[in-house]
Amino acid sequence: MKIISKMLVGALALAVTNVYAAELMTKAEFEKVESQYEKIGDISTSNEMSTADAKEDLIKKADEKGADVLVLTSGQTDNKIHGTANIYKKK
């Protein structure tokens, strides 16, 4: 039973990491590969309760717009979390 439970947890973890295609990069990481991408827009999130929720929302929005990469440009925590990001598609 423990083996089945471990396999199920592993499968769920793999499924969760592959739900979204867009990759969140830091500005420093993106600067190394910037020439391979073109900017396709900006996205934002607001009124999220946790940083994990804000990150998930930004990645989901980037994926919906066909982005391959998103780079955070701002974030605030005035009782709730707000954030913005630039989104890029591979050339």
UniProtKB/Swiss-Prot annotation:
Q: Name the NCBIfam families for this protein.
A: PRK09929.1 (NF007400)
The biological process GO terms on file are:
response to radiation; response to stress
Instruction: Say yes or no: keyword Signal present.
Output: yes
GO CC terms: periplasmic space
- Please name the source species: Escherichia coli (strain K12)
Has keyword Signal? yes
Question: Of which family is this protein a member?
Answer: Belongs to the BhsA/McbA family.
Q: Keyword annotations for this protein?
A: Periplasm, Signal
What residue stretch is flagged as signal peptide? 1-21
The cross-references to Gene3D superfamilies, in alphabetical order and at most eight, read:
Flavin-binding protein dodecin
Protein name in the entry? Uncharacterized protein YahO
Which compartments does it reside in? Periplasm
